[in-house]
Amino acid sequence: MRSGQSSRTEPASLPWHPSGLVAGVDEAGRGPLAGPVMAAAVMLDERQPIMGLADSKKLTPARRASLFDEIRAKALCYSIAQASVQEIDALNILQATLLAMRRAVQGLRLRPALVLVDGNRLPRLDIPAQAIVKGDALQPAISAASILAKVQRDHWCVQVHAEFPQYGFAGHKGYGTAMHLAALRAHGACIHHRRSFAPVARSLPGACR
């Protein structure tokens, strides 16, 4: 696999690759104590521009939700994939994230000529790829991918909250807030918690606290 890394890329410099289409890839959910890590791959259509694309973390939930629908309606194609809690615990969070990214690219209906990935690590692909630090703020396709991954994971948290309301997943989205840590101490871990993460491991039966 040919690959490269860049810490700076002009936002409009790579909408199309000379030999074909470009896909942007990003993830959501590396830091939380529970749930899968999500990844999305997006190939934008320059004939249908989407205004306001940005790093998903800098957008309000309402704006993310609006863009989530617009991206899915206007993109040439997109794919959302995940790596499970079991895979995170077996592989570690970095390798599970790269696995989810690879699955997202493999799920695209069209084959890109170049894959732009947010961050400084690349998943194993059979397509030329470039890692771009802060790519979610620099490349519209990566911004779109970050929004799809974030909103999809937030949806998962809301659904799981109905099953396990005592943990408050709908509010903290799985992150290690004071409320979440208190719930872990009170109730122990549920099936969706990442047992390889230290705060969860400390809540398991027999763990030293």
Swiss-Prot record:
InterPro entries: RNase_HII (IPR022898), RNase_HII/HIII (IPR001352), RNase_HII/HIII_dom (IPR024567), RNaseH-like_sf (IPR012337), RNaseH_sf (IPR036397). Belongs to the RNase HII family. The keyword Amino-acid biosynthesis does not apply. PROSITE patterns: RNASE_H_2. The lineage of its organism: Bacteria, Pseudomonadati, Pseudomonadota, Betaproteobacteria, Burkholderiales. It is found in: Cytoplasm. This is Ribonuclease HII. Its EC number is 3.1.26.4. Its cofactor is Mn(2+); Mg(2+).
